[in-house]
Amino acid sequence: MSSWILLAHAETSGFGLNLDLFETNLINLAIIIGLLVYAGRGFLGNLLSNRRAAIEAEIREVEEKLASSAQALSQAQTQLKEAEAEAARLLVEAKARAAAVRQEILDKAAADVERLKATAAQDVSTEQQRVLDELRRYAVAQALSRVETQLSQQLDEAAQQRLIDRSLATL
């Protein structure tokens, strides 16, 4: 019984406006949607197809980036393992070198101590010999001094002359 905007009512005797908004809006909306679907099918299809292609391209690009990132991560992990192995090797070498240097220093210090002991012993021996020689000279000088004193007191002039002559003869 109803039609589009201008509708004729069977009960009334003429044409008039249908003021029932609900009925007229639904009909108008159905007509507009039908026209849009009919006219915009190609356009909307192309638009959706292009959008789908763009999304698929972005997905492929993201997947490629993911694959390259995974490969880069794998390479970085490999390099990290190699670096850790190298660091461990260097640490072992450094410890071994430190132990060798330590032993070398200890050996050198022991040799220096022995050399110093030998030098000190030689110095002590030399000093001891010098002191003994000096004591001997002092003892001889003291003995000679006493002998001279005693001889001069006990010997007369003639006995002294004979002693001097005998001493000169033995030389």
From Swiss-Prot:
Record membrane topology: Single-pass membrane protein
Q: Under what name is this protein listed? A: ATP synthase subunit b
InterPro entries cross-referenced by the UniProt entry: ATP_synth_B-like_membr_sf, ATP_synth_b/b'su_bac/chlpt
Q: Which Pfam families match?
A: ATP-synt_B
One cellular component (GO) term of this entry = proton-transporting ATP synthase complex
Q: Which PANTHER family match?
A: ATP SYNTHASE SUBUNIT B, CHLOROPLASTIC
Where does this protein reside within or beyond the cell? Cellular thylakoid membrane
GO molecular-function term, one example from the UniProt record? proton-transporting ATP synthase activity, rotational mechanism
NCBIfam families per record: PRK07352.1
Question: Record keywords: RNA-binding included?
Answer: no
For this UniProt record, the keywords arranged alphabetically read as follows:
ATP synthesis, CF(0), Hydrogen ion transport, Ion transport, Membrane, Thylakoid, Transmembrane, Transmembrane helix, Transport
